[in-house]
Amino acid sequence: MAETAKKYPEFQKDDYFKIDVECHLSGEANKKYFNYYPEYRKWVYGTAETARAFGAVPHHVTKNWKEPPTTKAEKSEMAEEDQLIVYLDRYGVDMACILPESMMETTGYSTKWSTNGQLLLAAEKYPDRLIVQPNLGPFIKRGMKDVLWELDYLAQERNCKLFKFYPPEDTYINDERIWPFYKRAEELGVTVSIHTGWSWCPPGKAKYCQPLLLDDVVNDFYDLKIVAFHAGWPQCKELNMVALSHPNVYISLSLIMPWYKAAPKRLAEIIGEAIQFAGPERIVWGTDFYGPGGLFREAVIGLRTFEMPEQLQKDYGFAPVTDEIKRGIFGTNLAKLLGVDTSKRRAK
């Protein structure tokens, strides 16, 4: 931590227990096996443009999306989970909900970038730091029989409590063909995280992940616990309205925190309205980490230094974001949802 503070003077140690709700182990070592797919190269281009728009750490840079990408992110020969722990300790993050990168639409549905099994092995190395968040999709191509079997196995035999649904590679959030998945998740008492808002990177389809579609799901499965990633941006208002009257809908700030520097007013409006409609106890923090360690730095500093502008408090009635609220968003809200003990810090 001392080395981190020296390199980044604005970064100082704090006492917030932090859990990253969205941390991808994206199979960096595997990408050389499928980077020839044109759809993968479109994804790389989209990722770079998203990083530029958010003012986050750029990962891939290429002048022509058809060309093989070059990587400017921090290089490491370490296993992804080992490098992740270095980042967690460097930036004072206690735990991370790790999820595999499916992205089968980028490989012609021939392979996933990383798998649930790989993440289970990674978590065995750091059981007090890593929480496995399996991705059971794509639901439609797999079929419900296999999806439900794996859901039961991972929940009951491997104690997984958080499951990711990535609509852009699959189908609409409210596709009734996947109702059996929601029903079984509700029965098991597990939480479902869902990518909401925009797809961000081709060839994923944005129409599949519109927050308004959640309304059908939570009306039919009122007790199902859902974490909506990315605050539903740019359809934040629709997500806030869904959360307003459905007490088991949580809003994740993953991806958007770098706007504390690049677009502070926009971020303040997103956070202020989410708290106003869902309540501070249903807002959770995350990075949307996919490789660059700087994403942790930006997400930590972004929330830690955040203050609700007085003008927005006056114009919209937004509440001040107190230290207690930040503590909940950083970790204790998600800890209560997943049954995590926060009495002792885990970041070294």
Name what the model sees in each region.
Residues E22-N30, H195, H230:
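Histidine-centered divalent metal-coordination motifs
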